[in-house]
UniProtKB/Swiss-Prot annotation:
Similarity remark: Belongs to the protein kinase superfamily. Ser/Thr protein kinase family. Aurora subfamily.
Protein name: Serine/threonine-protein kinase Aurora-3
Post-translational events: Phosphorylation at Thr-176 may regulate activity and degradation of AUR3 in a cell cycle dependent manner.
An annotated Gene Ontology molecular function: histone H3S28 kinase activity
Residue list for modification Phosphoserine: 167
Residues the entry annotates as binding ATP: 28-36, 51
InterPro entries, per the entry: Aur-like, Kinase-like_dom_sf, Prot_kinase_dom, Protein_kinase_ATP_BS, Ser/Thr_kinase_AS
SUPFAM superfamilies: Protein kinase-like (PK-like) (SSF56112)
GO biological process: phosphorylation
Residue ranges constituting the Protein kinase domain according to the UniProt record: 22-273
EC number: 2.7.11.1
GO CC term (a single one): chromosome, centromeric region
Catalytic reaction list: L-seryl-[protein] + ATP = O-phospho-L-seryl-[protein] + ADP + H(+); L-threonyl-[protein] + ATP = O-phospho-L-threonyl-[protein] + ADP + H(+)
């Protein structure tokens, strides 16, 4: 990476950022490669999240390519349900990503606190994700790692896709294992070529998890999880009570043949989504 950092935004003006431009606040989270802090741009007082990644960790885990790809992809995307990456800078030891601040934090925390979501909340988030993925797929971006930990909520309860570390910008089929075990599509488990349909599969997994509190193919071991995924060992518990329309959507997404999964467009037109999703994508009543 060059010593200079660029923010190509309105008017294509380039801003050279440094740590002196920010007032650093409380820590927001900690990851494998660094930490995230609440921060405020000193001049404008604009609140952001500052993701700090240690270069030593980048070297240790050999994630140069993955990080560069994440930065390039996320900087280029502009969608209300995708977290903005405003720019980046670095010093001798660290790389700093300047990110949109999502006041509500991780959807994962909300899900664990509440056990599961209501059908209205779940449908709203699946609709928001579908719109964001339709946009990504239109830009030849496959996310490949959508999970509650990678989904943030803003102050209104609007969903934001946050982590593009496993994303890939490609119009061709790919053949690498990535993403999180419980969310992997069968073609990825078998290390077969995969395309945009892996994201459609993940929408089915998430819809199930939103409504029941756990992913559908969860098992004691990785081997057993993979077996359940490949068998499409799908069952719907009696509690909590979930509508047949919701189960219908999930069943049309968790299909082994990628070409037979419900398309993003059809997801957004599904009766359960139309009936339950908030058109503005807001879940103001959710406890964040």
């Amino acid at each position: 990476m060059s010593k200079k950092s660029t923010e190509s935004d309105a008017g294509n003006t380039e801003k050279q950022w440094s740590l002196a431009d920010f007032e650093i606040g409380r820590p927001l989270g900690k990851g494998k490669f660094g930490r995230v802090y609440l921060a405020r741009e000193a001049k404008s007082k604009y609140i952001v999240a500052l993701k700090v990644i240690f270069k030593e960790q980048i070297e240790k885990y050999k994630i140069h390519h993955q990080l560069r790809r994440e930065m390039e992809i996320q900087t280029s995307l502009r969608h209300p349900n995708i977290l903005r990456l405003f720019g980046w800078f670095h010093d001798n030891e660290r790389i700093f990503l300047i990110l949109e601040y999502a006041h509500g934090g991780e959807l994962y925390g909300v899900l664990k606190q509440n056990g599961h979501l209501t059908e209205q909340q779940a449908a709203t988030y699946i609709a928001s994700l579908s719109q964001a993925l339709a946009y990504c797929h239109g830009k030849c971006v496959i996310h490949r790692d959508i999970k509650p930990e990678n989904l943030l909520l803003d102050h209104e309860g609007r969903l934001k896709i946050a982590d593009f570390g496993w994303s890939v910008q490609s119009s061709n089929k790919r053949k690498t294992m990535c993403g999180t075990l419980d969310y992997l599509a069968p073609e990825m488990v078998e290390n077969r070529d995969h395309d945009y349909a892996v994201d459609n599969w993940t929408l089915g997994i998430l819809c199930y998890e939103f409504l029941y509190g756990n992913p559908p193919f969860e098992a004691e071991s990785q081997k057993d999880t993979f077996k359940r995924i490949l068998k499409i060992d799908l069952s719907f518990p009696l509690t909590p009570n979930v509508s047949e329309e919701a189960k219908n959507l999930i069943s049309q997404l968790l299909v082994k043949d990628p070409s037979k999964r419900l398309s993003i467009e059809k997801i957004m037109q599904h009766p359960w989504i139309v009936k339950n999703a908030d058109p503005k994508g807001v879940c103001a009543s959710i406890d964040i």
